[in-house]
Amino acid sequence: MCGIAGICRLDGQPLNEDARAHVRAMTDVITYRGPDGSGIWQEGPVSLGHRRLSIIDLSGGSQPMQDVDGELCIVFNGEIYNFAELRQELLQAGARFHSSH
């Protein structure tokens, strides 16, 4: 059971570094939900934080996760059991991955 926290300015204005500190404080409060790791990503009006409980993909599941171009970011809590099939479908559609899993 991981933990997710974040701030988003609905007016589109960029967040300052105080927002990162606030998200860090939010993820610190939920450390019990994910004691195995944490991460924060901030860009423009969005700051995302994650606390990780490692069950599957122990070494490569650090979050927040970005696409290979650094344009998209996601925090995710759950398991995708058909990931191999989805990966093949996405590869055939031209998607690029920066991990082997």
Task: Please report, for each region that a protein language model flagged, where it lies by residue.
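N-terminus-centric sequence/structural signature that marks the extreme N-terminus
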Residues: 1-101
